[in-house]
């Protein structure tokens, strides 16, 4: 591991349509092979499908979904006296958002709908209703942290 200073965090510019940084980060997560235009089209089409299906503002639905996906606790491996313990720790805000977006996009890609636009839209709507694979991932993470609560005193 490098002993030099940590690289500075780069600021993400808000997207032009919704003026939101989290939407830009979603576009970056959806992007494959550097094709940002294609990724932006997928995300914006998914948002218009959400607006059509729910009648609510797509950005509000997305933010509700993200609140339902982002984890509060996770477990981290800690070596104590020759054995590894899964120690529950709180998740930092930046990592919460990153994990939430990662789980959302991965769950969308695993879905069965025909186009990525449909998969993303359905997964966001499911997450906003507290269902779907991405919310299940969060629940599993919280369950794991709860199960290992006995090791919380090993926190560092």
UniProtKB/Swiss-Prot annotation:
UniProt KW keywords: Ribonucleoprotein, Ribosomal protein, RNA-binding, rRNA-binding, tRNA-binding
Q: Does the keyword RNA-binding apply?
A: yes
Q: Which GO terms describe its molecular function?
A: rRNA binding; structural constituent of ribosome; tRNA binding
InterPro entries per UniProt: Ribosomal_uS7 (IPR000235), Ribosomal_uS7_bac/org-type (IPR005717), Ribosomal_uS7_CS (IPR020606), Ribosomal_uS7_dom (IPR023798), Ribosomal_uS7_dom_sf (IPR036823)
Q: Which Pfam families match?
A: Ribosomal_S7 (PF00177)
Q: Which BP terms from GO are recorded?
A: translation
This protein's GO CC annotations: small ribosomal subunit
Can the keyword NADP be found in this entry's annotation? Answer: no
Source organism, top-level taxon: Bacteria
**Known role:** One of the primary rRNA binding proteins, it binds directly to 16S rRNA where it nucleates assembly of the head domain of the 30S subunit. Is located at the subunit interface close to the decoding center, probably blocks exit of the E-site tRNA.
Listed under subunit, the entry gives:
Part of the 30S ribosomal subunit. Contacts proteins S9 and S11.
Q: List the PANTHER family hit by this protein, alphabetically.
A: RIBOSOMAL PROTEIN S7
Q: Which family does it belong to?
A: Belongs to the universal ribosomal protein uS7 family.
Protein name as annotated: Small ribosomal subunit protein uS7
Species the sequence originates in: Streptococcus pyogenes serotype M5 (strain Manfredo)
């Amino acid at each position: 591991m490098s002993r030099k200073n940590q690289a500075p965090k780069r600021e993400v510019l808000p997207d032009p349509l919704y003026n939101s940084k989290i939407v830009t980060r979603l576009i970056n997560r959806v992007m494959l092979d550097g094709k940002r235009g294609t990724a932006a089209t997928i995300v914006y089409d998914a948002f218009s499908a959400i607006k059509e299906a729910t009648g609510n503002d797509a950005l509000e639905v997305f933010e509700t979904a993200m609140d339902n996906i982002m984890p509060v606790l996770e477990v981290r491996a800690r070596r104590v006296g020759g054995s590894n313990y899964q120690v529950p720790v709180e998740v930092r805000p930046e990592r919460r958002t990153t994990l939430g977006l990662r789980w959302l996009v991965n769950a969308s890609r695993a879905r069965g709908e025909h186009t990525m636009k449909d998969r993303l839209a359905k997964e966001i709507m499911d997450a906003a209703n507290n269902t779907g694979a991405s919310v299940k991932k969060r629940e599993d993470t919280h369950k794991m942290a709860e199960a290992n609560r006995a090791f919380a005193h090993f926190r560092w």
